[in-house]
A protein has these predicted regions:
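Structured alpha/beta or helical-core interaction and ligand-binding surfaces enriched in interleaved
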Residues: 1-46
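Short, compact, well-ordered microdomains
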Residues: 45-67
Length: 67
């Protein structure tokens, strides 16, 4: 299961990953993805933060905290 967040302003990805590691046993990995040019223009954002979990409950818990 993937939780996606567009990165705006001062969102702290390091803190978000540390929280996932400590609180979500099924945390698998994370990726910071640079958006394509059209998507950048459409939503005025350059990067997306993807966090991967093996369990839907952890993904939901993480979403409630960070999204």
């Amino acid at each position: 299961m993937i939780v996606r967040k567009y990165i705006y302003g001062d969102f702290n990805t390091d803190e978000a990953v540390e929280w996932a590691i400590k609180n979500c046993p099924s945390f698998e990995k994370y990726m910071i993805v640079e958006l394509g040019w059209e998507e950048k223009q459409e939503i005025d954002c350059w990067f997306r933060f993807d966090v991967y979990f093996n369990d839907e409950k952890d993904a939901t818990f993480y979403s409630l905290m960070w999204i």
